[in-house]
Amino acid sequence: HLEGTAKLAQEYCIDLLKPMAEKIAKYHDIGKYAKTFQKRLEGASVSFCHAVCGAIAYQEQANQRDVFTPMLTYCIAGHHTGLMDGGTRVDTPEDGTLAGCLKRKEDYTGENDYTTYQEEYLVQPLTAEEEQPALAELLSVRKDPFEVLERYAFFTKLLFSCLTDADFLDTERFCNPDTKRGMQGDFKQALEILNHRFSE
């Protein structure tokens, strides 16, 4: 599923961000390696937030000066719940912010330990070479801090969308392989109807 989601996320993404789409997809479900989550698959009624695990792992492995680490951890941690508030350094693990979630490492020990993924699945954070095109894009507008923030936010939302679509469709392909996808309809007629209604 991680590889399938990574392939789809890259297909949906613009060239500039394809390496990031691949990374978030490969990290997004590593929390499912935890025994607690495996028990859920076997029918146990247990609660387990697997999405945070990938974000914690990514943050631990990434270069701490990498400007894209927050972007990628936002996407990974929120792939089921949506992009959350960033929070602040003083947030606690109980807070529902990204800063709070990333402090929950102690929650993932014992049967909640997900790090067994490392025994069979090799995943690495962004390299300097992979992030260079996106960094160059941000630096091209560095004289306008507002524009830098706008592009950073756009990149985050685009990556998040690529991940959630890819995750859903790869899961659907496994669970319901006969599902037909694609848009159908007479778009020319729909446009005519829309234009007519706006002209009334």
Please provide the spans of the model-predicted regions:
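Accessory nucleic-acid engagement/destabilization modules that flank
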Residues: 1-197
